[in-house]
Amino acid sequence: MKQPFPGKHWNKVTECTSSIYSELHRIALLYGCEASTISKKLEEKLEAVEMWLLRRMLRISWVERVTNEQVLQRAGAKREMMKSIRRRQMRFFGHVMRQEQLENLCLTGKVEGKRGRGRPRTKFLDSLAKFVGGANTPAGLIRKTADRAEWRLMVANVLGDTAPR
């Protein structure tokens, strides 16, 4: 890897570009992810974009055959994209479920009308219950959101955080 700014200034340039990455690109990628269902295919694409941005930031070409783990090590970063998306989704879900508004009805699937032919679309609530895992059903998740302290503790446990946010 050739350094565009050789010497002691290279670390400052890397720090600056990593802060730009974390502030601007992640915000653009995570915009509106709270209310969308993330499929396995979309999850893989988001992780690929995250790695592509890190490679661009460090000026590592695909031709150099540097593994993703080495790129993460050089950048001093971790794969945080999906964890951040899931955290946002769970916070959004808990917030919406404690209110009696239209968003609540949409997320719980209580919308009138006929469903189209074919395979049912994956619901947001089902994908969230699948992510949380264990014996948590969509109905169980809705019940747990009523107690804010219990919900925050569960979110922290599922995401592996040390303290609830």
Model regions: which residues?
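Short linear motifs embedded in intrinsically disordered, charge-biased segments
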Residues: 1-165
